[in-house]
Swiss-Prot record:
The protein's name: Prenylcysteine oxidase 1
Protein's UniProt keywords contain Ribonucleoprotein: no
Protein species of origin: Homo sapiens
Functional description taken from the UniProt entry: Prenylcysteine oxidase that cleaves the thioether bond of prenyl-L-cysteines, such as farnesylcysteine and geranylgeranylcysteine. Only active against free prenylcysteines and not prenylcysteine residues within prenylated proteins or peptides. Involved in the final step in the degradation of prenylated proteins, by degrading prenylcysteines after the protein has been degraded.
Catalytic activities: an S-polyprenyl-L-cysteine + O2 + H2O = a polyprenal + L-cysteine + H2O2; S-(2E,6E)-farnesyl-L-cysteine + O2 + H2O = (2E,6E)-farnesal + L-cysteine + H2O2; [(2E,6E,10E)-geranylgeranyl]-L-cysteine + O2 + H2O = (2E,6E,10E)-geranylgeranial + L-cysteine + H2O2
Cysteine pairings via disulfide bonds: none
Length: 505
């Protein structure tokens, strides 16, 4: 009798294990990976996506990466007399863990962001000037603004603390189907509320004074996003975090991360411009009709096309920037009308006319960077000494005592304006570009899932545009594409992740 019972228990146990291996997610067989994936845009978002898609789908999938200009996208550099300088995104926060990982994995080197003293100019005078002495800076800030600088630091730290949860979620492979759901998983209704309120409104409600907001907050928004405190509060917090210490950059230029990720992902770069994308039915080698995406692109004057199982769009869907048409989708893919901010970067090698900002002699000026307030009638957002991408230390003056200065402005500077800023100069180069979204809360972020297997990364820029935000969006899109391909619905848009993962420690 005992033997019969033992055999029955053994049989039931075997049956249970068999059922579990068939039904439990851990034991479920993965669907065969896609044959081909297309990524449109080879900036930090597109190349990060290629890197993470390769990790998830394995070595056999073919990844084509389309770029009509240079790898690196908006992480562009400008040349001044044979030296390269960052045109835009130049510093990285010490808590930007994706960027830190990329630099480590790719064998690149990090350099500390250049230091130097900073001043704030209101159109008439310097309302604040940094000192070389920390205690003097503290006294100046407390004397003029009370303890508002400390309160501001605490507010930004609270936002960053919640934001850091994304790294734990992504390390456990969780993904989100919309920007709003991602932000809600990090900071709940508070983060969503920040998208729908201006930074000015948020900080006024928190009790910050008009003087502090005008003199200390608005200039940071102007240098980082070319806009005022009317931007949304979330991107405002991201911008203010760039005032922290420990900022760094990639030696040789931040765009090296993009070329490194492209190479590490073993993706195929296609130097062409994508014209349109259309869903079509195609018979694959299995003999079964399959829904695929035809990507039609142009190289020079030649038009070509290819079919893909999955497509990721990693360039802003703005007519002035990508001009991609989505053909015959049902329902139609919505038009995107996100306006991007026009900004002009000007690099000038010359001797600054310090009398614009101060009556002190030029050798006593001492400031490396000057930011401007919103009510300044000066025609620039900011001006500062910049190192080349190869310099590891703060830049030294050339033999004639001149530096290379980077100027951000809303409009292209005229020669007369440059001559007003500089006593003399021997080189100037300008780059007008659409750098980041024009923020006007309340913000409605574009969908991440445009169609069944068609994804959009740059919608995250409506929350905040930054290198790390693009890398986060890329990792999320790669995870989302992977889980939806394999039917892992339990890994998408999960509620209570923070508490769930906290209990697993």
């Amino acid at each position: 009798m005992g033997r019969v019972v033992a055999e029955l228990v053994s049989s039931l146990l075997g049956l249970w294990l068999l059922l579990c291996s068939c039904g439990c997610p851990e034991g479920a067989e993965l669907r065969a990976p896609p044959d081909k994936i297309a990524i449109i845009g080879a900036g930090i978002g597109g190349t990060s996506a290629a890197y993470y898609l390769r990790q998830k789908f394995g070595k056999d999938v073919k990844i084509d990466l389309f770029e009509r200009e240079e790898v690196g996208g908006r992480l562009a550099t400008m040349m001044v007399q044979g030296q390269e300088y960052e045109a835009g995104g130049s510093v990285i926060h010490p808590l930007n863990l994706h960027m830190k990982r990329f630099v480590k994995d790719l064998g690149l080197s990090a350099v500390q962001a250049s230091g130097g003293l900073l001043g704030i100019y209101n159109g008439e005078t310097l309302v604040f000037e940094e000192s070389n002495w920390f205690i003097i800076n503290v006294i100046k800030l407390v004397w003029r603004y009370g303890f508002q600088s400390l309160r501001m630091h605490m507010w930004v730290e609270d936002v960053l603390d919640k934001f850091m949860r994304i790294y734990r979620y992504q390390s456990h492979d969780y993904a989100f189907s919309s920007v709003e759901k991602l932000l809600h998983a990090l900071g709940g209704d508070d983060f969503l509320g920040m998208l729908n309120r201006t930074l000015l409104e948020t900080l006024q409600k928190a009790g910050f004074s008009e003087k502090f907001l005008n003199e200390m907050i608005a200039p940071v928004m102007r240098v980082n996003y070319g806009q005022s405190t009317d931007i949304n509060a979330f991107v405002g917090a991201v911008s203010l975090s760039c005032s922290d210490s420990g900022l760094w950059a990639v030696e040789g230029g931040n765009k090296l991360v993009c070329s490194g990720l492209l190479q590490a992902s073993k993706s195929n770069l296609i130097s062409g411009s994508v014209m349109y994308i259309e869903e079509k039915t195609k018979t694959k080698y299995t003999g079964n009709p399959t829904k695929m995406y035809e990507v039609v692109y142009q190289i020079g004057t030649e038009t070509r096309s290819d079919f893909y199982d999955i497509v990721l769009v990693a360039t802003p869907l703005n007519r002035k920037m990508s001009n991609i048409t989505f053909l015959n989708f049902d329902p139609p893919i919505e038009e995107f009308h996100q306006y991007y901010q026009h900004i002009v970067t000007t690099l000038v090698k010359g001797e600054l006319n310090t009398s614009i900002f101060s009556s002190r002699p030029i050798d006593k000026f001492g400031l490396n960077t000057v930011l401007t307030t919103d009510n300044s009638d000066l025609f620039i957002n900011s001006i500062g000494i910049v190192p080349s991408v190869r310099e590891k230390e703060d830049p030294e003056p050339s033999t004639d005592g001149t530096y290379v200065w980077k100027i951000f402005s809303q409009e292209t500077l005229t020669k007369a304006q440059i001559l007003k800023l500089f006593l003399s100069y021997d080189y100037a180069v300008k780059k007008p570009w659409l750098a980041y979204p024009h923020y006007k809360p309340p913000e409605k972020c574009p969908s991440i899932i445009l169609h069944d297997r068609l994804y959009y990364l740059n919608g995250i820029e409506c929350a905040a545009s930054a290198m790390e935000m693009s890398a986060i969006a890329a990792h999320n899109a790669a995870l989302l594409a992977y889980h939806r391909w394999n039917g892992h619905t339990d890994m998408i848009d999960q509620d209570g992740l923070y508490e769930k993962l906290k209990t697993e420690l």
